[in-house]
């Protein structure tokens, strides 16, 4: 891994036909200095993004779960579920914007690339469970406790 670098470049001044006038009036070819401020951390993050195509494993993902309430009626329940996940150390975001659920799902899957989406409607709020959708697009019904246990184990095992 490289850290930030400083390089001498003899080729670019030649390619651009650069020259300066020296104190004695003669024309001289300059030597160009390049510096790269990106160090090993930035390069490593870039490699990770490229390797995983933005779909980080759950343990590494900045947002591990995105909670998507279907309507305003399920927003309070969505925040309750998110609180339970946060208590377990899961990085979670509630998307309680006034958007259609299809839009929220497409954004969470395609743009945000979160490992898990919890789609919560009135039915889930009444029954006290959650609809979990993973990256394979499979949706299953689970209890909150069951999902918290599963994702906590997945994060701890770094699977």
Question: Where would I find each of the regions flagged by the language model?
Answer:
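NTP/phosphate- and nucleic-acid-binding module
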Residues: 1-159
């Amino acid at each position: 891994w490289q850290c930030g670098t400083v390089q001498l470049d003899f080729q670019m001044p030649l390619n651009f036909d650069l020259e300066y006038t020296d104190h004695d009036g003669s024309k001289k070819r300059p030597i160009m200095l390049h510096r790269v401020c990106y160090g090993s951390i930035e390069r490593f993050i870039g490699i990770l993004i490229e390797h995983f195509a933005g779909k980080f494993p759950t343990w590494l993902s900045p947002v591990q779960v995105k909670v998507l309430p279907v309507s305003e009626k399920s927003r309070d329940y969505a925040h309750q579920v998110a609180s339970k996940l946060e208590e377990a150390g899961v990085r979670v975001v509630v998307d309680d914007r006034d958007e259609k659920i299809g839009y929220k799902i497409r954004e969470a899957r395609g743009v945000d690339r979160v490992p898990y989406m919890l789609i919560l409607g009135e039915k889930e709020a009444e029954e006290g469970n959650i609809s979990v959708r993973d990256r394979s697009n499979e949706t299953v019904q689970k209890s909150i406790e069951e999902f918290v246990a599963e994702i906590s184990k997945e994060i701890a095992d770094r699977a």
